[in-house]
């Protein structure tokens, strides 16, 4: 009996023990997770930077998806420019940087596509393999191009009033004995100084809206109040041009926003409408609720905007009619500020215009959530 028991125990051990060992190995593997090799491959495959490893025969032995997306690796063959850089690396052992932007792009910064590559040996002791790191710098290139344009535009725009003030000051000195001439030149200097101050103020406001400075906390803002304040800011200018500003009836609408910024945005739209309207015409402002947003529309009966210019009117310093804008003291920044105010309020600005008929700019801002209206809706649903 004891012999049979021993034999049975051995048989069970031979059958069960391997299963237990295998189960423990599986548990250990699960607890350990992926191997280091698997982890590294996963990291490179998810990297926002393209990575490719090439040998001395121009055979790509490894590449991640990003390298293919950026068109540096095609059918396991490296881009010619990257391969030429790799050959220099194989010969010298020194790192090489290379421009891998699409060849058809004449100006990468303006087109929005800019790709840079850096090639280096995989290891210093083995010159059989080189690694190509591919960096999509398109966003940086676009920002740099925008910065250059902005600096150029600011320099040009500031030069005009500063130059005018310099000329007027010289004329003022030369006319010291003529009071009427002195007064005329002095009035022009004051106008140019005001224009310069307005431009600097709007540049500061635009930089604040675009920059990292924290915006004020958004709160409930009465739409009727901001419309009334915006109109009052430009009533004198409208009266001087015999332009009538009409508004629809008060609505009681409220939006989620910053009152000062919203007044600035509406005031800029009103100012723009007055500047581009003939004397004796009307500018109208209307309000309506659409979905979860409140829309404020400013309509003029002015010169209108050509289709090709409608996409550009929100660019900094862009003017549809430069002569008219300078005559009215415009800075070319008003609509750019409106665009950024809308974006910072999770809203939008859209334009309808027809040359010779006029234009309508519509600012759309999320409505302020009214707890009472929501509770009423819930009560109605319960009653149903």
From Swiss-Prot:
Top-level taxonomic group: Bacteria
InterPro entries named in the record: 2-comp_sensor_kinase, HATPase_C_sf, His_kinase_dom, HisK_dim/P_dom, HisK_dim/P_sf, Sig_transdc_His_kin-like_C
Enzyme class: transferase
Modified sites of kind Phosphohistidine: 156
SUPFAM superfamilies registered for this protein in UniProt: ATPase domain of HSP90 chaperone/DNA topoisomerase II/histidine kinase, Homodimeric domain of signal transducing histidine kinase
Span of domain Histidine kinase: 153-369
Induction profile: By phosphate-limiting growth conditions.
UniProt cross-references to Gene3D superfamilies, sorted A to Z: 1.10.287.130, Histidine kinase-like ATPase, C-terminal domain (3.30.565.10)
Disrupted-gene phenotype: Deletion mutant does not exhibit detectable PhoA activity, even under growth conditions where Pi is the limiting nutrient. SenX3-regX3 deletion mutant is more sensitive to phosphate limitation, showing a reduced ability to grow at lower phosphate concentrations. The M.tuberculosis operon can functionally complement the growth phenotype in M.smegmatis under phosphate-replete conditions, but not under low phosphate conditions.
Name of the protein in its database record: Sensor-like histidine kinase SenX3
EC identifiers of the protein: 2.7.13.3
